[in-house]
Amino acid sequence: MMPLPPQVPRRGGRISRRVAAALLRLLGWHVAGSVPDVAKCVVVAVPHTSNFDGLYVLPALLALDLKMSIFGKKSLFAVPGLAAFLRWAGVMPLDRARAGGVVDEAVAAFHRSKQLFLGISPEGTRHAAPKWKSGYWRIARGAGVPVLPVAIDYGRREVRFLPLFTPTADMAADHAALAALFRGIEPKHKHRLSWPLREAQMAETD
């Protein structure tokens, strides 16, 4: 398994790393590409067409010892015994009633953190999203951090880290440019592929 660069946030779990690496091998999957040497970024993992996607992404992250955070309902942290596990898993509490919503919460989290890899889904669903949501782009622009594209490729049976993407002031162009990085990636369910990714795949065959 590839070593992580010095700036990347780590979990620091030797046992979980070994168990996850063994599980990944058992599943017949592997990690490809390189994790960039940055302390902060928005992580975009696509295509997301099945609940099985997490079965491969989670052990890949654990095997690397990479700590990636996501948002979860704040109310979950009030459940006895659950808060400690959620924090270990990288889940950060999100107060949906707070003005500004997810974007402002995420930007604030980046500003107060020395290290943060924050996972955001641009598709927002497993069922053929007609367009990508703008949250990942607005968070990256607001926090001044790059986007790390991660491909879930069932054809090659790999979780692949792609080159960093720096968002510009043109959101529509950025959506298209980012989707183009995933050309040739095979999802679990092709009929559920989001339309930006379908358009990128069709452009490849033209």
Regions found by a protein language model. Give the residues of each.
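C-terminal domain-closing interface element
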Residues: 190-206
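S-adenosyl-L-methionine
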Residues: 187
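Helix-enriched interaction subdomains in cytosolic or periplasmic regions
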Residues: 1-17
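Soluble catalytic domains of membrane acyltransferases
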Residues: 4-9, 25-184, 197-202
